[in-house]
Amino acid sequence: MKSFASELSKPIQKPRLKEILKELQHIGVPSPCNLRLYHELISVIVPTFWNGKINSEIDFLLAKCFSTLLGLKLLCVRLDNFVQEANLQNIHLVTVYLELLEKAFECIDLDDNCKLIWESTVLSDHQKQSLWTEFIFFLGNFKITNSMSAAMLTFKVYDDSKRLKASSMADYIGVLSSKLACIISKPAVKTPEIYSKLFHYLLHSSNLKAFINPLIPLTQKFCVQLQKLFADLTVSDQMLFLNQLLLEHNTKYPTNFSYSTARDDRITGSLATLLRLNFSSTHFLRLIEFYWGVPTNLIIKRVEVVCSSISYKESDKKELEKTVDSLFNIWSNAQFLRSYTLLAQESLTIYLLLFIPKLEAKYLNNLSKSLMFSNAISCRLDSLDDDIRMHGMIMAEVISTYSGVSLSNPLAFDVPIMKTTKAKVLKSLSSLKDEFLPIEILNDESVIAETSIEKEETNVTHLEKPVISKNDDLIRGDDLEPYDFPDIDSEDTDDDPTVSRSKTHSPVYVQDLCKMLKDTESFEKQRVALENASKLIKRKSAFGTELRDHADELLQTLISLQNRFDLMNFDEMQMTAIVELLLTCLDICGPVICTNLFVSDYSMRQKILILSCISLAASKFNDDDNERLFPSQLLPGNLHDQFYSPTIEKISDELERKLVFPVMSECKDYAEGPKFLQTRYISKQSEIESKKPLPKANRLSLKVDKSLFLLLTSGYMLASRKTAFIEPLFLVYYLKTLGILFFETFTSKIEGANRMLREYVDVLNEVCRLRSDTPEVNEGLLFSFLAILEISSGRTLANEFGKHLLFFEAYTKFLFESPDQGEKVKSLSAAVLILFENKLSEFRTLALEKLLDDSAPLVPERFGLAGL
């Protein structure tokens, strides 16, 4: 090694350099000699012989030499030194080292590095373990990405057109995950457990999707190495990996909760077989205990129950009963009804209904006689919420059926709520007979779907054109001389490139619209599809079930659409189509769009698009005045779109003015004194009545709570710990959307109003705890306070939400006194404080009493504190 180092320090020819580099492929173990070799390579050889070509043999040999722990760390240290100096004269060296580090990262062989360290003869066992831990920590802590990103940002050597994989977090995770999957797939690897720490680091990274995707093929076959690695993980890592794997399948196999098809049964059975190849029933029991509140579709819930309940071991049956006991303990707790959202309660109820047929009758009989079960059913029957009472009735009926308590006279609640479609669907879950099916069904499913679509297209009968017989005697004109046509018409020739030979027709069916939108290679199809999307949706909503059958697919396609061709008014056409789809199929598209907002990996633009469409749809449900105006009463098209097209900012600003104006008028009268006496003509009663607007039915209030509002609140509470959902830009649109939904809904009395108000207050309380410094976020909070104070009565707020109301008032005072929030926030907070005083002037004592009730029992001395 010393001779190599001295030889590299002198001028050297390329053939001799190649021979030396081939001998230096395994010098990754730290030692003084190896360190000197790397110093000569990085200082002399790399700046001289690196050319950055793809097929260069010297570049490849250098990258292989530096693809060890020592080489990678030296490159990162050299880049960090350049960043600290920030000398632009070193830009050429920085570019060379960046390219070398990128290629060395691609050449990393985890198996070779493992053998290099663990089979070393110069290291002790303790040194081997320490060096391997350092190598895994170096890769899992993203040191390469951090050093490359800092160098690229400082010297600006690469733009977006040429991106290095190792500098991108997602690409870095994807490459390492692919290398890890390649190692695990090798049957010769005897100890895959040594990679469990790297698995842990990548599993807790910021991009789980990039980590999971390369590992999915391993789960589709029986892999002993994956099982060994999975067993060496901690329980929390096991559950996190399984949950993310199921979420990927959740997006791949969507379903409709309203009805179960034979396709769902086949997918459930084959997917359960696929997942049980490498994971035991105990893993899925733990997964349900950990993540029963995660919003997944019915297929995934059925798969989890099948994988966790079908087993021939007595120990697994005991574990199943323990898991059901723990789930029933949560379900029967009185705090569960008050603390968890309705979506989470329904999710746990579905799991229990799916588990009941898998349990023995003796266990269910003992459960039905227990005090825990009796208290749970009685608490739900006493609830004022229809859905909660329905859950209790269904659970009582199903358990009485399967426990054999009343075979001759089964329990049945003959009430209207049990005759609804949702109640029938929930009750039918206990009669599902899921079982393991062959895995090949998953591969055949896409083929079946494609062939069914092709059959539908071929079955469309094309009407033949009517044959019109012409009588030559009638149309013959002997006295008319025909014109002479030229032999060649240059304007109509087929060789004219300006003539469009195939015209793209407007879509007639919803399925055709989806196909045209998905065709990302045709500019004309994208343009025609977007221009006609809203018209086709409105036309199809008037008759038939075609739109409802394909509403989910059309919604997903519209949201994921990108402006690849720079179409004019692309955003407006996309938003108009989504809004029209929400207006016509809110019961189908509402839950899908709200769930995907928090579950799917959407960009910030797509999240803002979803929230804006929800707000516009809510405002259009009860506002159709614009459609009744004659064209003469409207501005020209472009001016009308500019000044009157609704956006979420315009809607929220209009509502703010509507809510704040009465308060400001009262303050102005109080400050300036009473106005002089004004007189006006007293009109006839008939004239007054004729000018009043006609009352309109609030169509939004019939669907908003279960289709939009509750899903938005519960989804945020479950995902509020993720960084993407506490960014100021998202919070601004989210708060304004909730405020618009709340205000537009409560123009008439609706059922479940208290539940909506409670969940709205919980979300605002969670956002207030963030203490955002962004004025726009605080403006959204104040807008929400205005909506709550305007809609709800003072007694209801003080009695139900006294503690939260006083907290909101204190937070508003903090914003009013803060010098960094701006004039708009200060004026809004002043109006909110006045409304707080008006609402709580008579009920402040009641709010304080409720606040004291939450902390400790009332004693006579504390009534004095409350001002009683």
Swiss-Prot record:
Q: Which InterPro entries match?
A: TEL2_C_sf, TEL2_Regulation, Telomere_length_regulation_dom
Please indicate if the UniProt record lists Isomerase as a keyword: no
What domain of life? Eukaryota
According to the record, the signal peptide region is none
**Pfam family for this entry, one:** Telomere_reg-2
Which GO BP terms, alphabetically? 'de novo' cotranslational protein folding
Query: What GO molecular-function term can you cite, just one?
Result: Hsp90 protein binding
Q: Name one GO cellular component term.
A: cytoplasm
Region span, Disordered: 484-503
Q: Which UniProt keywords apply?
A: Cell cycle, Cytoplasm, Phosphoprotein
Q: Does the keyword Acyltransferase apply?
A: no
What subcellular locations does the record give? Cytoplasm
Chain positions with Phosphoserine modification? S490
Q: What is its main location?
A: cytoplasm
Q: What is its quaternary makeup? A: Component of the TORC1 complex composed of at least mip1, orb5, tel2, toc1, toc89, tor2, tti1 and wat1. Component of the TORC2 complex composed of at least bit61, orb5, sin1, ste20, tel2, tor1, tti1 and wat1. Interacts with tti1.
What is this protein for, i.e. what is its function? Component of the TORC1 and TORC2 complexes required for the regulation of the cellular respons to changes in available nutrients. Required for normal entry into S phase. Regulates activation of the DNA replication checkpoint. Required for efficient phosphorylation of mrc1, which is essential for the activation of cds1 kinase. Also plays an important role in genome stability.
Family of this protein: Belongs to the TEL2 family.
Q: What is this protein called?
A: DNA replication checkpoint protein tel2
